[in-house]
Amino acid sequence: LTDDCEILVVGAGFAGLLLWYKLKNAGFEDVRFCEKGGDVGGTWYWNRYPGIACDVESYSYFPLLEEMGYFPTMKFASGFEIMEYCQKLAEKFGFYDKCLFHTTVERTVWEEEEQSWRVHTDRGDQMKARYVILANGLLTTPKLARIEGMESFKGDSFHTSRWNYNVDLKDKRVGIIGTGATAVQVVPEIAKVVKELYVFQRTPSSIDVRDQRETTQEEIDQWKTEPDWAKARRARFAKISSGRTALKANDDYLAGKVADFKERKQHTRELSTEEMMTKQLDTNFRIMEQIRNRVTT
C-alpha cells in the first residue's frame, strides 16, 4: 500500500481497540491499524496455553462492559474468554475494516516538507500518515531462556506464549522452567495429563488466595440496575492499586488490604520520600507475612 491516512496506529490489543472506540466516537474515520498477529487481542492472541487466565478480576479488567452489555462468566476470566471478548469488541465497533493483520511496522520516517510520516512495513507498504500512534504493548515477544545445549535437545520444546497444541503431552515426561504467573496457571492443568512433571525454579513463588468463582445471576441482576457499574468498580480498583484509600473495596479480601493501606496512610504531616517508601515497604511486608503464614499453616 502507498496511500495516505490521517492516523496510523500500531497494535490491535486492548490499547488499539479502545483507541479506535475513542477515535470513532470523536468523529475520526480516516484511521488505519497495523497488527503483526492474525487477529485482535494482543497478548491474549499470542498466549493460549492451558489454564491461561487474567489475574485481575474480570469485572475491573474488561473494558466497555456497559457498552457491550456483557458480564464475564468468572471472577477471573480465562484467556480464551478474553480473546473472544476482544473479537466481539472489534466486530461491534467495525475495527476489522480498519486493520491490516500479519503486518509489522518496521520503521517510520518523518518527512518535514510534507509534514507527515512515511510508514514502512514488512510487507513492502509505504503509507503516509499525519499522526502515528504506538499501541503495541510489551507482552507479545517471548523471552527465551539461554540454556546451554538447548539447540541439540532432540525432544519437543516450546515457549508457553507460543504453545504447540500439535504436541500431545499425555503420558509424557515434561519439564517446565519457571514458577512465575504463567507457570502457576500451566502446571495444575498439564499435571492432569502428563506421566511425570518436573518444575525447575530459581525462586519459590508466593501465592495468595485466588477465590475463583462463577459470576452469579444475583450479581448480574444487581449490576443491571446500576448505570456505569463497571466504571465505578474499575475506579475503586485503581485507587486500591495506587495505594489510595478506597471508599468501598470490591470484595472482602481487598477490603482487608484497603484497611491496611488506610492505617498506614494516617499521619499528621507530609511525609518525605524515604518515609513514604518505608511505610509502603512495611505494608507490603505485612501482606507477605499473611501469605507466608498461609503457606506454613
Listing of model-derived features with the role each one plays in the protein:
Residues 1-7, 12, 21-150, 166, ...:
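N-terminal FAD-binding dinucleotide-binding subdomain shared by FAD-dependent oxidases/monooxygenases
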Residues 11-17, 179-180:
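Glycine-rich Rossmann-fold phosphate-binding loop(s) that bind the pyrophosphate
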Residues 16, 139-140, 183:
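Glycine-rich nucleotide phosphate-binding loop and flanking beta-alpha elements
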Residues 18, 22, 189:
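Active-site signature of alpha/beta-hydrolase-fold catalytic machinery across serine-
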Residues 99-100, 155-158:
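Conserved beta-strand scaffold positions in the cores of enzyme catalytic domains, especially
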Residues 160-162:
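Active-site glycine-rich loop that binds ribose-phosphate moieties when present
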Residues 173-194:
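Rossmann-like NAD(P)H-binding beta-loop-alpha module
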